[in-house]
């Protein structure tokens, strides 16, 4: 059962790549669903979790939010989804949470800043370059901060990923083919050992979440 951990920079066509991979492999795409579960476990509004993830929460929201709880419940949900299999998890630190599982390819999609700004301006139907660049900067900072605080790593470090795709040079369709090829390769086939390791990670995450909930 294929499992793919996927992350992307804003305005890189990463969502198109992820959708194409899911269609090609028959996978469920999981993104916002993780946040919905985390919000439920923490008894807070879904919008609060979303704003925190996007780096748009206000000072009071940041002060009241329990980042440790978010991290614990996120890991539990991501690992639970991975155990079920046939899933592509977008974001939520999945590339770090699942990195030690040998049958899970970790993929990152990126592109040069100027191209991302152009793409976002088109998406937002605006000619305000400053606005688009600010939105990207805020998103990049939020992602980088989460990865640093939760995992102690630099989000852009290429050694954290099995495959990094630059959509300035590689078309979406080719990106999809490359991810599908990686997932089907012998290097990323599930084994008894990798399945047991994933199950063990999930069990430990569930125990941590249960303790936190109580």
Task: Specify the residue positions occupied by each region the protein language model found.
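Conserved phosphate-donor/acceptor-positioning beta-strand/loop module used by diverse small-molecule
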Residues: 100-123, 130-136
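Glycine-rich phosphate-binding P-loop
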Residues: 4-21
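Divalent-cation
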Residues: 91
